[in-house]
Amino acid sequence: MFEDLYDVIVVGAGHAGSEAAAASANLGVKTLLVTMSLQNIAQMSCNPAMGGIAKGQIVREIDALGGYSGIISDKTAIQFKMLNKSKGPAMWSPRVQSDRMRFAEEWRLMLERTPNLDFYQEMVRGLIIEDGKIKGIRTSLGVEIRAKAVVLTNGTFLNGLIHIGEKQFGGGRAGESAAYGITEDLVSAGFEAGRMKTGTPPRVDGRSLDYLKMNEEKGDTRPDKFSYSDETKPLSRQKSCHMTYTSLDVHDILREGFDRSPMFNGRIQSIGPRYCPSIEDKINRFADKERHQLFVEPEGWDTVEVYVNGFSTSLPEDIQFKALRSVAGFEKVKFFRPGYAIEYDYFPPTQLKHTLETKLVEGLYFAGQINGTTGYEEAASQGLMAGINAALKVKEQEPMILKRDEAYIGVLIDDLITKGTDEPYRMFTSRAEYRTLLRQDNADFRLTPQSHAIGLASEKRLRRMEKKLTESEKMVAFFRETSVSVADVNPVLEEKGSALISQSDKMFKIFSRPQIDLADMLKFEKVKEYVALNEVDQEILEQAEIQVKYSGYIEKERNNADKLTRLEDVKIPEFFDYHKIKSMSIEAKQKLSAIRPVTISQASRISGVSPSDVSVLLIYMGR
């Protein structure tokens, strides 16, 4: 049935698996995507949205690298918002509300159009491991499929257990079976496994809601998009979300179910996402709060199904229903399905290399929730990198490892490998020390050349990026070289409450003032003439504005990143014996021996490794 040897097999077709399969196949290697249901590719198991704070930057990075998530998010969006627009550009984060059904449909269409990619529907029961190397997979029907590399992207399916009140049953997602056998094979091979928990809110009938009792949340008046390619366009129409609140009455009703809650009666021992707690966890931990926000999110253009964001719960279904009916606008709500919690297996990510290949089994890669992360975007980015590196390994090429100053994806993977996680990890801008460098607007500058060099990002993408870079640099040079007269600039400065000038000055200096924005600069004739003559579009104008106004911050971060790069250049031998260094702390020896960092820089970020330990290590490496 499967006589030929595949180059790469991807197990699981969620966000991680879909990106992994696409990347591997697009790099020209023979790839097989195995999933329990071909009808459920790239499902949005939780909220119908992509992007958000730090997550939007990741989607842009995936797109810049040649992944599919940005394009598909644009094609299936029903609303666009640029979050944190009142803050500096390092914090701006794009987010779209998505059409859940169209999102999954578009993913399947794009995957089916991808060359070198085959599909097979069946549950994977086990792994074929020989002499410390992956050799393939074994399905529930006993079919063996051989491959040079395997990427596991099992999501919440590994020994998944669903909880609704006092009821519990096996499942990887509502209405779908859990996956059994893989965890057991991995543990037998020497891997450490753990358990995590996540949850999801009820889905309700939008026709039963009174939106007049809620606050309308509209999209941006000038919506942007995720993808840097010209394959997609910004939305021409948008669908509103709404916001309402819980109340003390709602909280009292929810407490009635605490004695039947798996969270409070001890049946759920696993740790859930810190930054996405269940509604029962919120009212228990923040008992002094009189209300909590609920975002009412439509599931698409052509469906009445609504997602109640902020009401994730595993309380009994009767309590869920009773409590929601006490929320303003939900007095006559009809349920499509109740919320639930799910426990699943994961594998502490310190067992991986920065390529996402496992240290124990050569050719085996992990991506997504199996690594302890939460979120579509985090999963998709890991899948992309695992797919890239699995394909590069098969082709006997150097791996692609993104550094912390190159991408949020680099921060994410480095955090997982060097620090590990014992709770579902999600990305925040605060996790990135170089966030002024890692903005959502410049992911193409940072990553497209690297991706093009390995054969993933297209020539067309590269040319578009180079054109954008050239035009924005020319615009910045124009501001540096062009002066503005006292007569022209002082009225603008006076209007903005900024200090007046006594002699003409360079536009760059004027533009650098915090009170002066792009709209002010466009009042000057010289700027208007330049823009008209060079046909400068909004994207270039905004890029130039960021480069001018934040040049000092950007330069400072670049210098700091360059210092870090020097430590990245100091390699540690793969089987280095840390125990022979007498002046290093015992904890550092244990942590370094377990995690096996590749560079001094990675070693310095491991919890329990002090600056003095790093200094000793540097001396030992002859630096």
Model region roles, listed by residue range:
Residues 128-144:
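Conserved beta-strand-loop-beta-strand element in the redox core of flavoprotein oxidoreductases
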Residues 307-373, 401-414, 537-591, 596:
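A glycine-rich dinucleotide-binding beta-alpha-beta segment and adjacent secondary-structure elements
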Residues 37-39, 55, 184-321, 418-491, ...:
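An anion/pyrophosphate-binding glycine-rich loop and adjacent beta-alpha core
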Residues 431, 437, 448-615, 619-622:
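Extended, charge-enriched "interface" segments that sit outside catalytic cores
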Residues 11, 144-155:
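Short hydrophobic core segments
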Residues 2-16:
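Beta1/beta-strand and adjacent pyrophosphate-binding region of the FAD-binding site
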Residues 5, 22-126, 141, 153-173, ...:
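Conserved N-terminal/central alpha/beta ligand/cofactor-binding core
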Residues 379-400:
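Internal hydrophobic alpha-helix adjacent to the cofactor/substrate pocket in enzyme cavities
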